[in-house]
């Protein structure tokens, strides 16, 4: 199985992100923990899934480095919005475990994305 993972960082935190709008990835806590391990995996503070949503532009699932789902903080939300923009998404109303969020991309280049969350 080929896995397409992306690594984003913002304000000192780094994240592994998957585009899961087609529900391709169903990772276990053990797999997430291994991916986030800095010695044996990609290494990250957490992992996110950009998902499909019927009500919003997309959904967000965030997992801490221990493999378990957590709530959104600012840095992960900004990184996911930047990832969504790089994947061609133009509107940024999304739901996460802690509810509805909206964001605005203020600046967008291939290597930099400034997000208001």
Regions found by a protein language model. Give the residues of each.
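A glycine-rich beta-to-alpha transition motif near the start of alpha/beta enzyme domains, typified by
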Residues: 1-112
């Amino acid at each position: 199985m080929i896995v397409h993972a992306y690594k984003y960082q913002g304000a000192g935190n780094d994240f592994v992100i998957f585009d899961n709008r087609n529900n391709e990835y169903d990772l276990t806590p053990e797999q997430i923990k291994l991916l986030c391990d800095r010695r044996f995996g990609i290494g990250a503070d957490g992992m996110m899934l950009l998902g499909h949503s019927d009500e919003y532009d997309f959904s967000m699932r965030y997992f801490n480095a221990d493999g378990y789902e957590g709530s959104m903080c600012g840095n992960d939300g900004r990184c996911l919005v930047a990832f969504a923009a790089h994947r061609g998404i133009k509107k940024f109303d999304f739901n996460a475990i802690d509810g509805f969020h909206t964001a605005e991309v203020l600046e967008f280049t291939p290597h930099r994305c400034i997000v208001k969350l």
